[in-house]
């Protein structure tokens, strides 16, 4: 599973690069917003990425869940922190929230193996 997820992350980055070539101004602006929103500030970057995972779970965006889970892990978020955030998804999103929350936890475990 880890190889498959890493392949998907590579593909996500490739697709973003292709979109950046097709729409350089829009993607440059988007990447600037993403960088500004997720850098350390009053909240550490790891917490911001956990929030992004929670929002991706609520939106049902599987690639977003994978991407932001990998970023949370990169910023040293713990499994316990992710699980707490995912509990809020379950509270607010019911069954669909639980389904995508379980994916986020599985992605974290696989990428952290």
Curated annotation (Swiss-Prot):
MF term (GO), any: peroxiredoxin activity
Xref: InterPro entries: AhpD-like (IPR029032), AhpD_core (IPR004675), CMD-like (IPR003779)
Family assignment from sequence similarity: To H.influenzae HI_1053 and P.denitrificans COX locus Uncharacterized protein 4.
Name of the protein in its database record: Uncharacterized protein H16_B0147
Superkingdom of the source species: Bacteria
């Amino acid at each position: 599973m880890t190889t498959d997820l890493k392949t998907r992350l590579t593909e996500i980055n490739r697709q973003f690069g292709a979109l950046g070539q097709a729409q350089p101004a829009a993607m440059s602006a988007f990447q600037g917003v993403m960088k500004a929103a997720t850098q350390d500030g009053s909240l550490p970057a790891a917490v911001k990425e956990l929030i992004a995972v929670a929002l991706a779970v609520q939106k049902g965006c599987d690639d977003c869940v994978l991407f932001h889970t990998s970023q949370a892990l990169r910023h040293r978020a713990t499994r316990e922190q992710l699980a707490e955030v995912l509990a809020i998804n379950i509270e607010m999103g019911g069954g669909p929230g639980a389904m995508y929350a379980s994916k986020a936890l599985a992605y974290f475990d696989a990428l952290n193996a």
